[in-house]
Amino acid sequence: MGTRLLCWAALCLLGAELTEAGVAQSPRYKIIEKRQSVAFWCNPISGHATLYWYQQILGQGPKLLIQFQNNGVVDDSQLPKDRFSAERLKGVDSTLKIQPAKLEDSAVYLCASSL
């Protein structure tokens, strides 16, 4: 108890904030019908210039769909551009949209960021 109180007091005195670090992504999960549209949103770690969207199909490793550096696209060679679109707003938040969705789009979609 005493050690925890001391650490808490030290953090307060240093002016440090206890925050949740990491990439924020929503929705956590989404189930839709074929031919419907779906959009995913990502907020990268503060200060990270590079943002990635990955698709991971069951039983496979993650596949890079698109990579942004600030506002610009670095690599979108694996993005199926006929139905998938992605943008990065003001070098911060990003959206990934699938319209219309097909059965083969069933996957986990992951967002990551780096310096």
Curated annotation (Swiss-Prot):
Gene Ontology process terms (BP): adaptive immune response; cell surface receptor signaling pathway
Keyword field contains Signal: yes
Chain segments annotated as coiled-coil in the UniProt record: none
Domain of life per record: Eukaryota
Matching SUPFAM superfamilies: Immunoglobulin
GO CC entries: plasma membrane; T cell receptor complex
Principal subcellular localisation of the protein: membrane
Cysteine disulfide links: C42-C111
Binding partners and assembly: Alpha-beta TR is a heterodimer composed of an alpha and beta chain; disulfide-linked. The alpha-beta TR is associated with the transmembrane signaling CD3 coreceptor proteins to form the TR-CD3 (TcR or TCR). The assembly of alpha-beta TR heterodimers with CD3 occurs in the endoplasmic reticulum where a single alpha-beta TR heterodimer associates with one CD3D-CD3E heterodimer, one CD3G-CD3E heterodimer and one CD247 homodimer forming a stable octameric structure. CD3D-CD3E and CD3G-CD3E heterodimers preferentially associate with TR alpha and TR beta chains, respectively.
Protein name: T cell receptor beta variable 11-2
Organism (species): Homo sapiens (Human)
Lineage: Eukaryota, Metazoa, Chordata, Craniata, Vertebrata
Gene: TRBV11-2
